[in-house]
């Protein structure tokens, strides 16, 4: 059983082809700069070698056609024929309240997904382009949608509602939805497998820390709260996003700077966060170098970044009524030891104790808490694509 997983962005398509009998990745890569000058496909060969194939890719259908042709090409192919692809699983960003689990895509489902476009005007239409492209090229292959927001649909209303006039929720669906749900679901399940424990009765805080970041509180395997909101702008300090900010500060800045809604959205989403404070970069590796060189704004940005994560862990420990497992994932969470140690420093009162030697781990599954730590602290690399492929397989087998 071979499943192709697609993640279509506004100008990019990432893909992974899995053989689900072994969960082996047969092929992976991505197209960048769709519709722009200099578009290309970057792929990883089975031996780990990377190749870049340049080609003019005006839109998503041409991109997916290029990917499929590459998958069966004599030189870079992983399969002999496209008939070997049994199904396609799509990362779908915003499923609103309509989707609390992964679904087989049909006209009714896609119409409901299109109705959520207002909530993710950049991402949802791009996801849809991917689905339509596959329908055009492989009309008989079943497609499954896996929603970033679905895992968080178990939050209680008092956690997801905003304290604004209730009719704004009724009219426009303004509430907390949360994102990175497929990642939070994967790592929270995987850490229980890794530790050999039952998710039932466990209180887990999952920290997905990358250029974008979010934290979730998970009780008995279900999400009860998460840091991102109606959009991915709420919560943690991120690479270019502000995270939590007083709404009054937003209107104040709009007046002072003469910004409209688009302008202030651009400021908070693309020019803020670590980049905005440090003036150096949104990349934590570059920020680290600036911190090491003694750059005061970089030092401030890093402290703010770590502090916000720590604050959310404390809040979610309260929401859960304690915590059994704290888990780090995402590009920064998996690879940056100082992020994990700084965040956990001062949490000893909660029973958190890091083993500095164990914490040197990068990008692999590990327990990094000390043997006498009451709370287990773990690193679990996320695998959203495998989760999407697994869901797709489960739906096919229904």
From Swiss-Prot:
PROSITE patterns: ACETATE_KINASE_1, ACETATE_KINASE_2. InterPro entries: Ac/propionate_kinase, Aliphatic_acid_kin_short-chain, Aliphatic_acid_kinase_CS, ATPase_NBD. Substrate binds at residue 91. Its EC number is 2.7.2.1. ATP binds at residues 14, 208-212, 283-285, 331-335. Its cofactor is Mg(2+); Mn(2+). It catalyses: acetate + ATP = acetyl phosphate + ADP. It is found in: Cytoplasm. Mg(2+). Can also accept Mn(2+). GO terms for cellular component: cytoplasm. Its main location: cytoplasm. It comes from the Bacteria. The record marks 180, 241 as: Transition state stabilizer. Keywords: ATP-binding, Cytoplasm, Kinase, Magnesium, Metal-binding, Nucleotide-binding, Transferase. Pathway: Metabolic intermediate biosynthesis; acetyl-CoA biosynthesis; acetyl-CoA from acetate: step 1/2. Disulfide bonds: none annotated. One of its GO terms (molecular function) is acetate kinase activity. The keyword Cytoplasm applies. SUPFAM superfamilies: Actin-like ATPase domain. GO terms for biological process: acetate metabolic process; acetyl-CoA biosynthetic process. Homodimer. Catalyzes the formation of acetyl phosphate from acetate and ATP. Can also catalyze the reverse reaction. Belongs to the acetokinase family. NCBIfam families: ackA. This is Acetate kinase. It comes from Phocaeicola vulgatus (strain ATCC 8482 / DSM 1447 / JCM 5826 / CCUG 4940 / NBRC 14291 / NCTC 11154) (Bacteroides vulgatus). The lineage of its organism: Bacteria, Pseudomonadati, Bacteroidota, Bacteroidia, Bacteroidales. The gene is ackA.
């Amino acid at each position: 059983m071979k499943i192709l997983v697609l993640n279509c962005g506004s100008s990019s398509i990432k893909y992974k082809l899995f053989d689900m009998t072994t969960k082996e990745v047969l092929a992976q890569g991505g197209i960048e700069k769709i519709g722009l000058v200099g578009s290309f496909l970057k792929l990883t060969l089975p031996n780990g070698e990377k190749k870049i194939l340049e080609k003019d890719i005006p839109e998503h259908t041409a991109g997916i056609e290029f990917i499929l042709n590459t998958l069966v090409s004599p030189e870079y192919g992983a399969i002999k024929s496209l008939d070997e692809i049994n199904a396609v699983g799509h990362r779908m960003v915003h499923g609103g309240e309509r989707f609390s689990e992964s679904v087989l895509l049909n006209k009714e489902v896609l119409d409901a997904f299109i109705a959520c476009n207002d909530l993710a005007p950049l991402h949802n239409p791009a996801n849809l382009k991917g689905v339509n492209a596959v329908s055009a090229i492989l009309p008989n292959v079943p497609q499954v949608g896996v929603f970033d927001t679905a895992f968080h649909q178990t939050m209680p209303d008092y956690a997801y509602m905003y304290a604004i006039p209730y009719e704004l929720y009724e009219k426009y669906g303004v509430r907390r939805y949360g994102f990175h749900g497929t990642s939070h679901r994967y790592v929270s399940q995987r850490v229980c497998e890794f530790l050999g424990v039952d998710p039932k009765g466990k209180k887990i805080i999952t920290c997905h820390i990358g250029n974008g970041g979010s934290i979730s509180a998970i009780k008995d395997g279900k999400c009860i709260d998460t840091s991102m909101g109606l959009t991915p702008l709420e919560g943690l300090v991120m690479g270019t996003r502000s995270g939590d900010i007083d709404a009054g500060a937003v209107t104040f800045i709009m007046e002072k700077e003469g910004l409209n809604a688009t302008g202030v959205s651009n400021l908070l989403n693309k020019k803020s966060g670590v980049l905005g404070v440090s003036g150096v970069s949104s990349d934590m590796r570059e920020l680290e170098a600036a911190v090491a060189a003694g750059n005061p704004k970089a030092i401030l940005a890093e402290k703010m970044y770590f502090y916000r994560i720590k604050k959310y862990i404390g809040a979610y420990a309260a929401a859960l009524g304690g915590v059994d497992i704290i888990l780090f994932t995402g590009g920064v969470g998996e690879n940056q030891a100082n992020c994990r140690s700084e965040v956990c420093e001062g949490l000893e009162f909660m029973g958190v104790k890091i083993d500095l030697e164990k914490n040197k781990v990068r990008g692999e599954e590990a327990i990094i808490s000390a043997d006498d730590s009451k709370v287990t602290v773990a690193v679990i690399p996320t695998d959203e694509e495998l989760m999407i492929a697994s869901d797709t397989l489960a739906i096919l087998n229904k």
